[in-house]
Amino acid sequence: MTISSKISSDFDKQSALKVITGLNNFNIPQIKQMALASEIAKVTYLDIVADTDIIKEVESVSKIPICVSAVKSKELLKCQKTGVNILEIGNYDCFYEQGRLFHSEEIKLISKETRNLLPHATLCVTLPHILKIEEQVKLASDLQRIGIDMIQTEGKSTSISKTDHLSGMIQKSASTFSSTYTVSSKIRLPIISASGISSLTSPIAFLYGASGIGIGSNIRRLQDIGSMVIYIYEVQAAISSNHNIQQNINHSIQSSKISHQLIPY
């Protein structure tokens, strides 16, 4: 795996944050805004559609590390030649809206083909939420054997969750967190939680074993760079606060005279 030290460090510290512009988003002005906001807020990397023209547009305004997402290995191959940092098979939401579903065998086939074409690229694969938890664990294990570098979990798609905004976000985040918790306990790859992640829910992802999170829909609703930066800062503050709480709890337990009485679970 070839990955920048900044990205690797953020994953190691369980503080990686990526901004997702969307697999079906070709709105260049909006993508540029999100790229600039991400760079100002110092997010780990930006996740965009696998399109060489959009890569050029982003690179014209920002030096932020780039991940490109697609479901076809040839599209990823084209983008890899531009020097992007991460290639991702995933972001299926726009396909779910069309009734297009992805199952384990197809994901493995695409992953094998991509790895064979690009043996040294950093590859991430999203586990489809339509799979049962045990199927997601099996797929993640198979992907680890194929040589995939990172796994992303997702929640129920917006086309399936026909609820109000807050309820839908909670439902989606609960779904991706349950996948993150189970998968992270079975494999040794970094896990990214995405879908329904907000400043409210982001700390939970790391408690459940995530090495990073992806946010997108809440940022795309904002109209200017300043608002986007403020929202990203809110998420980062929530993550930082959670890490401080974890450190304090761990320190208190380790220094406590009754720590041996605690029951591990």
Swiss-Prot record:
Similarity-based family: Belongs to the ycf23 family.
UniProt xrefs under Pfam families: DUF561
Signal sequence extent: none
Record protein name field: Uncharacterized protein ycf23
Principal subcellular localization: plastid
Intrachain S-S bonds: none
GO cellular component: chloroplast
Membrane-traversing stretches: none
Organism listed in the record: Porphyra purpurea (Red seaweed)
Domain of life of the source: Eukaryota
Keywords assigned by UniProt, alphabetized: Chloroplast, Plastid
Localisation per UniProt entry: Plastid, Chloroplast
InterPro entries, per the entry: Uncharacterised_Ycf23
